[in-house]
């Protein structure tokens, strides 16, 4: 079952990306290194509600 999730920057707390994940394969919250246009650098983005 795939679910839509938002990814928020850990530096500025802005929600920059929407993605989906498979809850069966990734039951925990995902963390990805993505570009934040407000921080102007690559930062870790964590899954939010």
Swiss-Prot record:
Gene that encodes the chain: rpmG
Q: Write the record's keywords in alphabetical order, separated by commas.
A: Ribonucleoprotein, Ribosomal protein
Where does the record locate the signal sequence feature?
none
Provide the protein name: Large ribosomal subunit protein bL33
Q: So what family is this one in?
A: Belongs to the bacterial ribosomal protein bL33 family.
PROSITE patterns linked: RIBOSOMAL_L33 (PS00582)
Q: List this protein's GO terms for biological process.
A: translation
Classification via InterPro entries: Ribosomal_bL33 (IPR001705), Ribosomal_bL33_CS (IPR018264), Ribosomal_bL33_sf (IPR038584), Ribosomal_zn-bd (IPR011332)
- Report which superkingdom the organism of origin falls in: Bacteria
What are its GO cellular component terms? Answer: cytoplasm; ribonucleoprotein complex; ribosome
GO molecular function terms here? Answer: structural constituent of ribosome
Which Gene3D superfamilies is this protein grouped with?
Ribosomal protein L33
């Amino acid at each position: 079952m795939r679910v839509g999730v938002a990814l928020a920057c850990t530096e500025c707390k802005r929600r920059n990306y929407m993605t989906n994940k498979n809850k069966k394969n990734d039951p925990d919250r995902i963390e990805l290194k993505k570009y934040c246009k407000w921080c102007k650098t690559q930062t870790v983005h964590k899954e939010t509600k």
